């Protein structure tokens, strides 16, 4: 099909919105669970040994997630089916979440978490590849903007389940399970994507792999910074102002994620209209580094909040748009699920790197030194993206 015809053919807005809702369901599946519900559950079953078990479960879970995403993405490539894997992963994810309400031993909880991570990535791996099957290049910016709803929905779900008197510990897990089904099931039941031509590169020469590697590395560098702020945000703010509350930090985190949605949508649409897919990514990475520089220089809580807002908005926009534009640089369409699993390593590997990086720098040199290093990583990401071809 001629390039002009491919540019004129677009996926239906209905499918794009249903897909974005399903992707948000994926975020709801792990954000409130890993940040709120899992620590509570570990404390309930492990008592005073909760820190050691949380570290072990987090580390093991990251490895299981990395393996599972590649494995099930590859299997969905081989079978030529995405929906079946997504539906099976959804069922396993929900079932294993509910099973955690009856676990009473730390070792059993560890086993369930490993299985849950596999089930979660049985859903997420093929789900990410499904977008590559259905969304043409001309709409990848819009897709990335829509994906910005996912972290915001995950954060809002965390706020919802912690409302006073809404539900107990087990009830919160059940509520999360219900929200996942409500978000993912509509795409499986009613998502009927139009048959649109999706550009592919049949030979995948070495030149085609270079943008893939560049995009992978650029995301990894930004994700390391994001993972550090995600894990140590409260501790950092209390180093600036000791009396700051957990509730304030949670609200700040949520507001930033929600505010990033319209920015990501506007940037994604601009990238599509102007055929500049990588420019908004480079700008976002540069702004992310700028926010980290502000954080490194902050001596008051107001400056710290301002620096985090710049960093949080830019990073959320970057990660959302990057998820859409990644589909543009995959070398071979028949290995789309597997290759996206490789890209998913940029989401899990930082969780393995970041604790050691923080321990090496913060106790001796403070958070300012850590933020300077993270800013250099973000600026390097921007430089890498700036060197990519215009389209």
Residue ranges and their predicted role:
Residues 49-52, 137-146, 246-247, 331-343:
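Loop-to-transmembrane helix entry/capping segments in MFS-fold secondary transporters
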Residues 171-189, 369-387:
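Symmetry-related core transmembrane helices of the 12-TM Major Facilitator Superfamily/SLC fold
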Residues 5-62, 213-218, 222-242:
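Helix-loop boundary and gating motifs at the non-cytosolic
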Residues 38, 122-135, 317-331:
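Intracellular juxtamembrane helix-capping segments at the cytosolic ends
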Residues 334-363:
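A late C-terminal transmembrane helix in Major Facilitator Superfamily
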Residues 68-81, 263-276, 362:
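Helix-to-loop junctions at the C-terminal end of transmembrane segments
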Residues 84-99, 279-294:
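Structural signature of the two symmetry-related core transmembrane helices
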Residues 65, 141-161, 344-354:
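Glycine-rich segments within core transmembrane alpha-helices of 12-TM secondary carriers
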